């Protein structure tokens, strides 16, 4: 899949390239909601509709996230994880959107296995892990303060779900005047249709969408 596919009507007639290089000193990798609970989707009778998501997570998203982690760690660049989990077992500290019935009714207690980061991409020593009860990582944590304290100007957002927590975080970061990059091959939504549609909406307005390999090539 090429980066050019994610062009909305607003930018389809423009040859728009924002990034010629990415600074190692002022760029952070933010990994959003890649947690154990989501590895079960598509593998049970009641979640079979997520089989496409499950395959993409296993074969594309996790391998490319590993690749990004390797390159960021090799360069001693900042890595931050964010996960969705409640501080209370009953989940009363969750935001309203996480308490409503249906898909968004997410109850993951912070100490439970399901809420932990997937083992194969688990954080290493001194890699920050934030816990949120919201879609946006900025709204639900002190991420904004951390990024400012760390002198971060550009944030690479990987993770799930493209059309939900990733999108909410990207928009919030953009509104706070951070440059945002989204690797299309290290993110996923419930379906490819949702994934592609959301990236097309976000691209060139709230972020720049590109491949993981392109991001690595731009690191300087």
Show where each model-derived region lies.
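A short alpha/beta connector and helix-capping loop motif
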Residues: 25, 41-72, 76-79
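Short acidic, Gly/Ser-rich segments with clustered Asp/Glu that frequently serve as metal-coordination loops
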Residues: 35-41
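A basic- and aromatic-enriched beta-loop-alpha substructure that forms the phosphate/nucleotide-
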Residues: 80, 84-86
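Surface-exposed, active-site-proximal loop segments in enzymatic domains
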Residues: 44-50, 93-97, 173
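Active-site-adjacent betaalpha module
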Residues: 1-28, 70-75, 87-90, 98-220
């Amino acid at each position: 899949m090429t980066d050019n596919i994610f062009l909305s009507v607003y930018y389809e007639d423009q040859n728009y390239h924002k990034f010629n290089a990415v600074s190692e000193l002022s760029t952070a990798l933010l990994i959003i909601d890649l947690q154990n609970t989501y590895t079960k989707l598509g593998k049970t009778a009641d979640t079979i509709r997520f089989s496409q998501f499950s395959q993409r997570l296993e074969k594309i998203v996790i391998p490319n996230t590993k690749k990004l982690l390797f390159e960021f760690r090799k360069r001693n660049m900042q890595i931050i994880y964010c996960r969705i989990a409640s501080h209370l077992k009953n989940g009363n500290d969750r935001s309203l959107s996480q308490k409503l019935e249906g898909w968004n009714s997410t109850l993951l207690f912070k100490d439970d296995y399901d809420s932990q980061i997937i083992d194969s991409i688990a954080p290493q020593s001194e890699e920050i892990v934030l816990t949120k009860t919201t879609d946006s990582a900025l709204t639900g944590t002190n991420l904004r303060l951390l990024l400012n304290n760390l002198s971060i100007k550009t944030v690479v957002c990987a993770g799930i779900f493209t059309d939900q927590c990733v999108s909410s975080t990207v928009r919030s970061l953009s509104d706070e005047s951070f440059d945002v990059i989204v690797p299309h091959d290290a993110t996923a939504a419930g379906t490819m249709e949702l994934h592609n549609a959301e990236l097309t909406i976000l691209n060139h307005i709230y972020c720049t969408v590109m491949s993981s390999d392109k991001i690595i090539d731009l690191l300087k």
